[in-house]
A protein has these predicted regions:
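Lumenal/extracellular ectodomains and adaptor appendage modules
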Residues: 1-191
Length: 193
């Protein structure tokens, strides 16, 4: 998983590495590979394979189904999606169909902060002149990885919503104050008999 920051979102790029050591091709068109993706994802897109072929896939209710014929050797499936963040942080719950000890999380150095009891910081790696911080998953019986991302740049709309609620509360308080004051003034001006 490669996690990059956006404005009020994170971009998640997942790379599935498949190794077919048999002499036969692996055909998943009748029994697709399935990946359960996080809730709330937006703008999903599948990248082309290294051969330039389009990978057949379907996304229904956060379940990605991949129908492809994989040749002998190594293949990669790369796809990307956005996850919206709220006030600069986000919790990701990602379920995998394989052991978590094969999962790595990378993020460009100096931007996002990642925290999880299930991840161990494993150092830095450089790709294409970008240095990434890298975490490896601890061995676990669970196939659910949970981690929190913070330091995500926040959109001004998130703050304007909070400002709007505060202003509305202030207006309601002032209106109630004047209503109460007007009612008290009417009571004191009424003649007593």
């Amino acid at each position: 998983l490669v996690i990059e920051s956006g404005l009020g979102t994170v971009t998640v790029t997942e790379v599935l590495a498949l190794s077919n050591s048999s002499a036969d091709r692996i055909d998943t068109r009748n029994q697709p590979l399935k990946q359960k993706l996080p809730e709330g994802l937006e703008n999903f897109r599948m990248m082309e394979s290294s051969s330039g072929a389009v990978i057949q896939h379907y996304l229904e209710n956060n379940l990605l189904k991949i129908e492809q014929d994989f040749p002998t050797g190594n293949s990669q499936i790369i796809y990307q999606y956005l996850l919206p963040a709220w006030f600069g942080s986000l919790e990701i719950n990602r379920e995998f169909n394989f052991s978590l000890d094969k999962v790595e999380v990378l993020t460009p150095e100096g931007y996002l902060q990642i925290k999880s009891e299930q991840l161990i910081f494993s150092g830095k790696q450089s790709f294409h002149d970008i240095t990434y911080l890298t975490w490896r998953s601890k061995a676990s019986d669970s196939n659910l990885l949970t981690f929190t991302i913070s330091n995500i740049p926040v959109t001004s709309l998130q703050y304007s919503g909070v400002s709007g609620v505060i202003l509305l509360s202030l207006f309601a308080t002032v209106a109630l104050f004047f209503q109460f004051r007007l009612n008290n003034k009417k009571r004191t001006e009424e003649p007593t008999i």
